[in-house]
Each structure stands twice: as structure tokens, then as C-alpha cells.
């Protein structure tokens, strides 16, 4: 059962602890509605002690956006969950900041989620990234040219703040769960338009690889990600130890304009290139 798989992921990565307050980013789409419903059910069925809030942002990009906002608000009202909504003009913000619409939307969402976290005194923010999102990210990193760090993909938990309970769940499982629970999530039709790189990877590249090379490409890249993560963790420990041995003086202050690190140059020059880069 999907809820059991999600609970296993939560337990494995220690995402949620007793007494946590969690802000869930909910768009109204299949992923976030699956996450919201699952966390409600997991809490009730397992008698877990955590509080849920919902944060929804209306980007003002599509005519369907207001309907999606009402859908999320109605669902939350039905389930007695406090829902925070913000409406913005992302296109306008993107132009003002001279960045892409996708980047502007992402920055806006995360800023809003943290705002609600502070307002509700919550300590976790749950994001509905799934296994397919992780695989797409890794492929995008490879296309752009990445080091081994880019092969790790999306982290299950970051800074002990952002948690991703669906990170081991495939999109097809999420869609089935939504159907079984009669959630009727809202579908963003722009996800099927091959305008952005991610959409092209999702709609064109992965189906082609599945058909022509490996039907289990999602599992294969997930395996690559897990191996890369273990290797990165080991390498980071190694680099930290070497750094300590090379360090002569360190003066780091977040408030200061000029920070200073002094290393033993002779020892530094004896290190392998991969250590120097790190």
C-alpha cells in the first residue's frame, strides 16, 4: 500500500518526529494532493503526533489557477486543516528580477513556505517531489554537465527542514492513489507542453530511453543516485579531514564582506585534483 511505502520513507530518513508541525506545499496537483492525503491518513491510522498546515500559492499564470485555489481551500476546510493562500503575478516578478518564470515561481514558493513556517511556529516543510522528479533532475544535470554531486539528485531531507516523503514513489503510483481515494486533483496542462527543459526530459527523453534502451531507466538512475550519494558522503568526510590538516587560519563571518582562509600551500599542492576541487 502506498501509505506504507511513504511511512517507510519517513521512518528511514527520520523526516517526522513526535510533536512536529509541518507546512505542506500544496498546488492542488496529483503529487501534492497525494502527499497531503497520505500525511492525514498516516497520522490518523498510526496515531502519530504531528500538526499539519497547508501553504498554497496562486501564481496568476493560468486561467485555471483560481479554481485550483478554491479546490485546495475546500479540501482543507473539509479536513479541518488551516490553509494559507497567497496570490502573486509571477510573470511580473520574473520581469522585474530579470529571471525566468520557473525560477521566479520557485523562489516565490519557497519564500512563502518559510514565511508560513515562521508564522505557525512549524519546524518542517513538506515538498511533494517524487522519484520521477529526482530522475529528471539527474538527467538535466548530466545534460548541463555535472560533477558527481549532480548525480545525487534531490535530497530526501535538507537542513533538517525540507522533507520529501514521496521521493521514493513513482508518479504512476501517485496517480493511482489519487484515483483510488477520489481526490480528483487539478492537472496543470503546461506540464505537457515541451517548452521547458524539464518537460522535454519528462515527455520526450525518458519515454524514448524506456522504449529504445531500458524500460527500467527510472530504477536504474535511482540506483546511480544512491551509489553517488554514498560516495559523496564518504568523499565529504575525507575532504573535511584533509581540510583540517591543511588549515592554518580561518576567519569566517557571515556578516563580513571579506572572509579569510589560509591553507598550507605545500601540503595543498600534494593533494589529488579531486580533493583540490572539493
Predicted regions span which residues?
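ATP/NTP-dependent adenylation/nucleotidyl-transfer catalytic domains that generate, transfer
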Residues: 196-278
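Core alpha/beta nucleotide-donor-binding catalytic domains of modification enzymes
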Residues: 1-26, 30-206
Amino acid at each position: 500500500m502506498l501509505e506504507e511505502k511513504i511511512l517507510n520513507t519517513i521512518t528511514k530518513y527520520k523526516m517526522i518526529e513526535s510533536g512536529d508541525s509541518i507546512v505542506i506545499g500544496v498546488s492542488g496537483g496529483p503529487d501534492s494532493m497525494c502527499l497531503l492525503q497520505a500525511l492525514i491518513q498516516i497520522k490518523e491510522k498510526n496515531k502519530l503526533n504531528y500538526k499539519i498546515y497547508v501553504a498554497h500559492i496562486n501564481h496568476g499564470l493560468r486561467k485555471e489557477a483560481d479554481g485550483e485555489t478554491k479546490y485546495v481551500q475546500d479540501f482543507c476546510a473539509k479536513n479541518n486543516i488551516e490553509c494559507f493562500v497567497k496570490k502573486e503575478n509571477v510573470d511580473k516578478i520574473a520581469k522585474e528580477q530579470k529571471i525566468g518564470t520557473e525560477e521566479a515561481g520557485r523562489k516565490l514558493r519557497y519564500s512563502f513556505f518559510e514565511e508560513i513556517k515562521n508564522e505557525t511556529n512549524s519546524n518542517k516543510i513538506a515538498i511533494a517531489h517524487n522519484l520521477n522528479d529526482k530522475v529528471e533532475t539527474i538527467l538535466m544535470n548530466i545534460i548541463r554537465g555535472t560533477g558527481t554531486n549532480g548525480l545525487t539528485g534531490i535530497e530526501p531531507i535538507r537542513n533538517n527542514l525540507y522533507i520529501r516523503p514521496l521521493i521514493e514513489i513513482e508518479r504512476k503510483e501517485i496517480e493511482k492513489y489519487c484515483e483510488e481515494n477520489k481526490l480528483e486533483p487539478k492537472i496543470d496542462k503546461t506540464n505537457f507542453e515541451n517548452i521547458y527543459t524539464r518537460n522535454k526530459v519528462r515527455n520526450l527523453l525518458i519515454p524514448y530511453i524506456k522504449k529504445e534502451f531500458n524500460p527500467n531507466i527510472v530504477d536504474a538512475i535511482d540506483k546511480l543516485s544512491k551509489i553517488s550519494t554514498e560516495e559523496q558522503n564518504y568523499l565529504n568526510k575525507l575532504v573535511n579531514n584533509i581540510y583540517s590538516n591543511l588549515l592554518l587560519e580561518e576567519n569566517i563571518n557571515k556578516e563580513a564582506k571579506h572572509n579569510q582562509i589560509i591553507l598550507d600551500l605545500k601540503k595543498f599542492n600534494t593533494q589529488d585534483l579531486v580533493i583540490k576541487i572539493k
